[in-house]
């Protein structure tokens, strides 16, 4: 792990503009349906990701279930998903919109699971079928999806990821929930789909 003031990184990757982001409130968590875990969990884990990203899918299949059971469902970590579309248009953007539209009906995580379970083989023509399968109001979902609601918010997520210094997906930030990163308690960047053990090591250190 490498320390850079208010920020630490693992895997030897240096990230920039971190103190400025913390001072500007970057990484602030809002209750928009993309949060798993207790609001008062001591640690917050942010993921910046794309539903079409192969390494993001690897995290979903191999690491996410273990983090969910050991840390999130036990109240130790609050998990927040952020969109980081790899292009300005196309299936990645459409998948992010579909998930947000599901979230508007309180069903973000079932759509998240469905999209990542497709292992990158996504087709926007199937999204309305996914909406039906997870019990959404189909007309409301179709209107939201067809009007491309949430695009501005999706791109804001990507801008936030860039300010943390990420240039690819997935990227993760670990920080204390109360107070955010400080010089004494810096945030931790975990770039890429690193093994579960890397997450566990950093989380356990912060919880100690």
Residue ranges and their predicted role:
Residues 9-20:
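Bacterial N-terminal signal peptides
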Residues 22-24:
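Signal peptide processing junction and immediate N-terminal pro/mature segment
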Residues 44-47, 78-81, 171-173, 189:
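Soluble periplasmic/extracytoplasmic beta-strand elements of cell-envelope proteins
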Residues 62, 129-208:
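C-terminal cap of thioredoxin/glutaredoxin-like
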């Amino acid at each position: 792990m490498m320390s850079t003031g208010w920020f630490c990184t693992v895997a030897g990757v240096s990230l920039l503009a971190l103190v400025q982001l913390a001072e500007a409130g970057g990484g602030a968590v809002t209750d928009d349906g993309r949060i798993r875990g207790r609001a008062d969990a001591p640690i917050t884990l942010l993921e910046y990701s794309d539903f079409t990203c192969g390494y993001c899918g690897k995290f979903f299949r191999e690491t996410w279930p273990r983090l969910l059971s050991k840390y999130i469902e036990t109240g130790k970590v609050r998990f927040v998903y952020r969109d980081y579309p790899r292009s300005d248009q196309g299936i990645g953007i459409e998948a992010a919109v579909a998930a947000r539209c599901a979230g508007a009906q309180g069903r973000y995580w079932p759509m998240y699971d469905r999209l990542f379970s497709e292992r990158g083989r996504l087709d926007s023509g199937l999204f309305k079928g996914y909406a039906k399968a997870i019990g959404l109001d189909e007309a409301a979902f179709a209107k939201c999806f067809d009007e491309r609601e949430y695009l501005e918010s999706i791109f804001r997520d990507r801008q936030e990821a860039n300010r943390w210094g990420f240039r690819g997906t997935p990227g993760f930030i670990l920080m204390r929930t109360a107070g955010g990163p400080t010089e004494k308690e810096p945030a931790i960047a975990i770039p890429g789909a690193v093994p579960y053990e890397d997450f566990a090591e950093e989380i356990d250190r912060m919880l100690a």
